[in-house]
Amino acid sequence: MGENSLKIVMYPWFAMGHLTTFLHISNKFAEKGHQIFFILPTKTQSKLDQFNLHPHLIKFIPITVPHVHGLPDGTETTADVPFPMYSLIRHAMDLTEPVIESLLRELKPHFVFFDFTHWLPALARRLGIKSVHYCTISPASVAYLFRDEPAADAFLGPPPGFPPSAISLHKHEARGVDWINNVKEFGSGMKFVQRMLMAAEECDAMGFKSCNEMEGPFCEFLEKKFKKPMILAGPVLPEPPTSTLDEKWAKWLDQFKAKSVIFCSFGSEARLERDQFQELILGFELTGFPFLAALKPPIGAETVEEALPEGFRERTAERGVVHGGWVQQQLILSHPSVGCFVTHCGWGSLSEAMVNECQLVLLPDVGDQPINARLMGGDLRVGVEVEKGEEDGLFTREGVMNAVRLVMEDDSEIGKEIRTKHSEWREFLLREGLESSYFDDFCS
């Protein structure tokens, strides 16, 4: 390593979306010659090895997840258990504090990056190490959601001083935020909002995968609120895939004309209720466009096949696939036949979509997803959101069809605006030198 090289420890939340996001930023640091020590659950390393692009600089440090009563043996990440057990994983992660302290004393890094371990800043400070709360969600989401409110209705609108924006929540979304923030015990006897506010208040800086051109006002709001630097890594674009699209999907997509296929994916953990699962795919059928939906089986079903509406498979056999397994999302999004991406609005998925040419249909569910949807659909005007019921949060097949047609059909005025805005943002994000400039500042 050079004289100016940094030693950085990464300790992300035990969820695959967080682990891969932290590894992505680790690859960027390694490109600049910095050394990374990446702490993760033992058996999870094999799932991440292929994404470590600089194994000579990024060293995985596997640790054993402490046993907590109620957790099945062998549990390591949120992918191993249903949502109600997540708090037990958080408790297990808190129990790793002595192990983390020992590692920090041994490694003597300049910085430690973390997200959910609210106790890490105080530990790092005692050891003379700077801590960075690296957020896997957007600055807009943190600015809107990180507040301790007494009632759900407070989340219908933004907090005082929030920048002018289209961002607000519907009643069903506000209730969901209130439940996560103030009702659901979030491990070790702490509420989610308490843990997140402590992490933000105690760290030395907060880091984001974003840029000023897209979210500058929200970063300024956060700097004033938490009185510390907001460091931006830039868009942190997905690495060019080293693999090729599976022949099965390449062959299937190749049979359709350019920009004609709907692709739908809701991430590795999201599961719909059966009736909403059926409304979604029936909406795709109504559009008349070919579609590929990569979805987990709905709640209560073992497979996607058993949850298909009666006669659906026969009616759509020539132009539709509902797949219950993992797919190469980044490669599918870049395929020339794909014209529309129906997304749950996870920040990582939106980042991948913004640098591709497919248009966005926004169907958020929980957490930061509604904020991301309003940012993309309202402030940036790069997507169309599927309408939902204000109280119950339910969508219909007709709502899905209408949103898809708005972005896909050439004679749609809204679609023309969306396509123009998306093209402008894509050109900006791919501009030569943009990401490198941001990341140089991030490292300094």
List the predicted regions and their residue ranges:
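Glycosyltransferase specificity loop/lid
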Residues: 1-444
